[in-house]
A protein has these predicted regions:
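Helix-start (N-cap) detector for alpha-helical repeat units in TPR-like alpha-solenoids
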Residues: 1-2, 35-36, 69-70
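Canonical positions in the second alpha-helix
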Residues: 26-27, 60-61
Length: 92
């Protein structure tokens, strides 16, 4: 595993969300096919309640690994949250 990604995971585990986000962005900028990095960034966005960004990153994970269950669940949970907060968005 990439040392920078390990650092981002450690920051995330210590609830340093902004630092973890910045670090994982470096990983993704150097390796856009790193599904593990997108998954971590999705988790960070989810914890920061940035639902759209989380869904985008979960979608990127699914492009790389279509069978990833965490990404599928994450998208559904974010959709449910958005549906609760903004029902007009899905039911015009």
């Amino acid at each position: 595993m990439n040392n920078t990604l390990m650092q981002a995971k450690e920051q995330f585990a210590q609830h340093e969300l902004a630092g973890s986000l910045q670090t994982v962005n470096l990983v993704i900028s150097n390796d856009q096919a790193n599904g593990e990095a997108y998954l971590l960034r999705a988790r960070i966005h989810y914890k920061m309640q940035q639902w759209g960004e989380a869904m985008n990153d979960y979608g990127s994970v699914l492009e790389i690994d279509p069978a990833n269950q965490e990404a599928k669940s994450g998208i559904e949970m974010a959709k449910n949250i958005l549906g609760y907060f903004a029902p007009d968005m899905f039911n015009p």
